[in-house]
Amino acid sequence: MSKEIGSEFWIGENNLLHDSNEMPSWLSRFGNVLLTTSGRGALSLLLEQVKPRVKTVLLPSYICNSVILPFEQAGYELTYYDVDRNLNPTDIELIKNSSAGVFLHMGYFGFSTNEILSDLVLTLKSESVITIEDVTHTLFSLQNDPIKSDFIIGSIRKWFGISSGGFLA
């Protein structure tokens, strides 16, 4: 018998994994991975654990509201940096000179549009800024490995017909 889950997907008993402790390679490449119910859940869990130097986050101007929500709920002040029409970050000086305690960046639609930030992320980390990469859009991209951020988050359910799924690494 099938059960309705999330009012969007049907799943039968024979489609469930039982006693599977092995992490798929597309997730294990991120190192220590914690599975969550969603990308938003991964971000919320992370924000409960970290203590930034100041509760201000720097976010790309083109971003899903579900990424913004955990920061708002945790009491962060939100600041945005611009991306151009190709979704490449453009406010490099704003990012460099920001006093934010947390910096979130991402590639879009399978492309490493945030690649330009690689060196800057290392600089921010050396200044005790917590850096987070959201790899939801680039999870299966063969373009590049993630930037060396402190944390990686992602939503798995954007890629599969499943009702929930996210991760924190």
Question: Which residues make up each language-model segment?
Answer:
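Conserved PLP-binding active-site segment in aminotransferase class I/II-type PLP enzymes
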Residues: M1-R53
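Hydrophobic anchor at the start of a short beta-strand
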Residues: V33, L78, T131
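A short beta-strand submotif of the Rossmann-like class I SAM-dependent methyltransferase core
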Residues: L35, L59, H105
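Gly/Ser/Thr-rich loops at beta-strand to alpha-helix junctions
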Residues: R40-G41, I63-N65, G110
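Short, aromatic/basic amphipathic alpha-helical patches
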Residues: D19-L27, V67-G75, L117-L124
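Conserved PLP-anchoring active-site segment centered on the Schiff-base-forming lysine
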Residues: L46-I95
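Active-site phosphate-binding strand-loop segment of PLP-dependent enzymes
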Residues: R85-A169
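Short, polar loop motifs at secondary-structure junctions
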Residues: N21-M23, Y62-N65, V135-N144
